[in-house]
């Protein structure tokens, strides 16, 4: 079983998504990542994870989402996609609104740069699915973030509650 965890840290700034940090590791439980999130000192507006957070562990009967709740992380599960092309297209539409801290996100950017389709040696063509290797974890984590529809979530009450009140009132940008 592969237990690699990849986390992108995003900040909404106007009509942009700033990818400000990236964390990846393996061989650690959710409690480790909860501790790492707390150490970062960020104020989180939400946590978004893939559909497999609902998988229940045989030993405890708890899902990964249940375990995360015990450490103060409430995930919104992003539904499974019907095909890989849908996820790739979501990232293609998402990236133009992103600004990436190249230093803090270097490992994640490397994953995106190296995410590839899998080659079928027998048939001499690419398969219709991506290659599952070290780069796929960061790329799939970005896909999950891209499909989280962050801008729509800004207007939701529970997401807005986590943001400090503005002292400037209502400002708008005109283009």
Predicted segments, located by residue:
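Short acidic, Gly/Ser-rich segments with clustered Asp/Glu that frequently serve as metal-coordination loops
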Residues: 1-4
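Mg2+-dependent endonuclease catalytic cores in nucleic-acid-processing enzymes, primarily RNase H-like
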Residues: 8-133, 152-153, 164-175
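Acidic, Mg2+-coordinating catalytic module of metal-dependent nucleases/exonucleases
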Residues: 132-154
